[in-house]
Amino acid sequence: MTMSLIAGVAAFVLTVLAMPHFITYYKIKKIGGQQMHEDVKQHLAKAGTPTMGGTVFLVVAILISLIFNFHVFTEGHPAYGATAGILFVILIYGIIGFLDDFLKIFHQINEGLKPWQKMALQIVAGLLFYFIHVLPSGTNSLAIGGLTIQLGVFYVLFVLFWIVGFSNAVNLTDGIDGLASVSVVISLIAYGIIAFVKGELAILTIIITMIGALLGFFVFNHKPAKVFMGDVGSLSLGAMLAVISIALRVEWTLLLIGVVYVLETASVMLQVSYFKYTKRKYGEGRRIFRMTPFHHHLELGGISGKGEKWSEWKVDAFLWTIGALASSITLWMVLGNVMK
């Protein structure tokens, strides 16, 4: 546990030291920044803000996790599969996000990777995780409370759905200063406690290391943000949460621990579906929310969408609180043996 905490502190310090150099390089080279939604006027001032900051905290977190978990890879440790699988997913999804950001920023391709290209790469990465960790472990079921759901060969489909789904869900959440970074920290704290109780110290080290790196990133990402994480950060973080829940055998918990990401994704799906339905039925599309993902709806008019505009700090605080409460309830359920 002590070494895990040292790893977290090291990740925080290195990220804080490295990020200013990344931001300065970005500005000196006059690299194009992230484009903003014109519908949210207060975001227009952020145009040109350096993005791809996730590259820094991912490199730091991966390297420090490898150093502090070195014994896992050299001594045939039982946690080898889970540790290697988690770090592999963080790396590969980070590369996918990096490619997406690179095309948008350096080649001025607005959509980055085409949706089918991004999805294909995410599925391949998910399959590799399945073969690295899940298949060797013999896992093919979901445990929810006292109920065990045997999925057999279909468990691989669940794994792919979980990883790809939450990877994109965190990506949707990363829309205002500090929201995604702190939301993921809250989620990781919950999983860190579960990992500690289960005695999964190698996984705990990865979790605490990423928490340290994200807190270091938040120093520059809180409002007004000096840098954004980009897809390189958000896609990787979402996939990381998914594989950690799988490795700890508490997959169901991510629906609660990750409730903010679920809410953000659900708002987009509902908005698109309702718009298409009403356009077919009434000849014009109608909306449930002022704008999606949900954090933009809050910005434009609060919970009802018709009230005063919310500041980014207020939106952050509201969604962070929801995430913290949901994570606390989940921990009570898991640690209190209500559900495992």
UniProtKB/Swiss-Prot annotation:
UniProt keywords, alphabetically: Cell cycle, Cell division, Cell membrane, Cell shape, Cell wall biogenesis/degradation, Magnesium, Membrane, Metal-binding, Peptidoglycan synthesis, Transferase, Transmembrane, Transmembrane helix
EC supergroup of this enzyme: transferase
Metabolic or biological pathway: Cell wall biogenesis; peptidoglycan biosynthesis
Major localisation: membrane
Cellular compartments annotated: Cell membrane
Reaction(s) catalysed by this chain's protein: UDP-N-acetyl-alpha-D-muramoyl-L-alanyl-gamma-D-glutamyl-L-lysyl-D-alanyl-D-alanine + di-trans,octa-cis-undecaprenyl phosphate = Mur2Ac(oyl-L-Ala-gamma-D-Glu-L-Lys-D-Ala-D-Ala)-di-trans,octa-cis-undecaprenyl diphosphate + UMP
One term of GO molecular function: phospho-N-acetylmuramoyl-pentapeptide-transferase activity
Domain of life: Bacteria
Membrane topology: Multi-pass membrane protein
Pfam families in UniProt: Glycos_transf_4 (PF00953), MraY_sig1 (PF10555)
Assigned EC number: 2.7.8.13
Positions of transmembrane segments: 3-23, 53-73, 79-99, 119-139, 144-164, 176-196, 200-220, 227-247, 250-270, 315-335
CC terms in the record's Gene Ontology section: plasma membrane
GO biological process, one term: cell division
Coiled-coil ranges (or none): none
Keyword DNA-binding among record annotations: no
Required cofactor(s): Mg(2+)
Function: Catalyzes the initial step of the lipid cycle reactions in the biosynthesis of the cell wall peptidoglycan: transfers peptidoglycan precursor phospho-MurNAc-pentapeptide from UDP-MurNAc-pentapeptide onto the lipid carrier undecaprenyl phosphate, yielding undecaprenyl-pyrophosphoryl-MurNAc-pentapeptide, known as lipid I.
Record family assignment: Belongs to the glycosyltransferase 4 family. MraY subfamily.
Alphabetical list of NCBIfam families matching this protein: mraY
The protein, known as: Phospho-N-acetylmuramoyl-pentapeptide-transferase
Lineage, broadest ranks: Bacteria, Bacillati, Bacillota, Bacilli, Lactobacillales
Gene designation per UniProt: mraY
